[in-house]
Amino acid sequence: MRKKILFYLLALFIFSCNRNEFSPNQKFDATTPEDVNAREISELSKKTAGAHIRIAVSGDTHTDYTDSKGFVDYVNSQDDIDFVVLNGDITNFGLLTEFQGIYDIYNKLKVPFITVLGNHDENAEGNFVYQRMYGSPNFTFDYGGIKFVCHDANSREHSFDHTTPNLDWLRMNLSKDEGTQYIMAFSHVPPIDADFDQTLRSGYENLFNSTPGMLASVHSHRHSADSIYRANGTGIPFIITNTILNKTFTIIDITNGQLTTHPVTF
Amino acid sequence: MANLLRTLLLFNILPLLLCSVQTARAQSKLINTLIPDQLIMQYAGSIGYISGGIGYNLWKEKSTLSFHFGYVPKNKGGELDIAAIKLDYKPFTIHIGDQLIFHPINPVAFLSYTFGQEFGFEFDSQVYDKGYYFWSPALREHLGLTSELKILGDGSSKIKSISLYVETNTNDLYAINWYHDKKGIPFTDIFRLGFGLKMNF
């Protein structure tokens, strides 16, 4: 009888775990997808944008798979969302298995999803994992006459060496592409946060405010109810959205360059 | 691992050096203590694509303490260098015929340390306030189970027996993620497999 139980336990633990692993820190394995952002942007470009654009902005999933699935199910039940943004902090520890866990869930979205790099995602080999899996942390894409500028604003992960956010790269890319009238930015850490390089803050805010056609800069990171601020009380809105951990995301509607937002709890 | 080995050696060698009178017997005893009881090769198991190690039997072969060094090549998700120390315990022994000994379920605990720039023992205190990130990027604590089949030799070779084992393990960070979302992350999903071979002397 004892032997039977032992054999049963043995079979259970061998067959229940199905994965070899070389290290929790390995940068990829045989099944890891590559260049997901490029693929999703290509999918998005096949869509025809209407007069109203609706974006579902989610952030800070960390490894809350349950609520991430809840979010994906909610978005899939809607038919008016153009695309989804996952605005950083996909992981807790920057580990491959965490990136893959969230990818597997977001990949079930019926609409394209664009993934931005968060501060937690830069831990250990996370930066490399992200770049192989999703692509460059600084990238742009166009949809519905709007140029979206996504970038790494996780200054603390770069030891506040004044390279992040990369203002030179932003200056070059904050110009309208052919066929776009407006520009919108996505990055994880908001300028008002202590994790943002405060020596770059005013330069960053001024750059956005002096960019013609700039609509808004959208951030997450703070795990709190949606808030909007304007630098010195004027200029474009800096929008800080909630976290999937709170079962909440933010809808951004854009019509003729007019932008409105509202949180949705699912 | 280098440090640990050094400590181990120092603790064994220092007393001998301090003694002015050494007997040949003591020397041979020391050498016998230091010669490992096992050479170990392992595939995967979270300490390298391939890893090699030496093991020492404890408590009448009920337990093994082993030291490993693992490597993940660039084309397998590296490059990573990893050192590990393992301690296992074999509570059950099942004899199958004359030549096979089966240890079906053996708890194992190990520490792994990943070398390299991205892996500080802790986060840089110049950049992060204490507790900003609570974990060590380099040091992982693992718990797992192994199952081992020992094939006995006929006594004619220096290698007394060969053991084949399969090991499943999880680590502190995977366990934390599971703890925070038990519904979304099945318990078995946090375990990873490795396979190994031991030559027992």
Regions found by a protein language model. Name each.
Chain B
Residues M1-L30:
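Bacterial Sec-dependent N-terminal signal peptides
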Residues T33-S46, G52, K62-P73:
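Transmembrane beta-strand segments that form the barrel wall of outer-membrane beta-barrel proteins
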Residues P36, I47-Y49, L80-I82, R140, ...:
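Membrane-spanning beta-strands of outer-membrane beta-barrel proteins
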Residues D37, I50, G70-K76, F92-I94, ...:
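Sequence/structural signature of outer-membrane beta-barrel proteins
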Residues N57, S63, F69-Y71, N75-G77, ...:
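Outer-membrane beta-barrel domain signature
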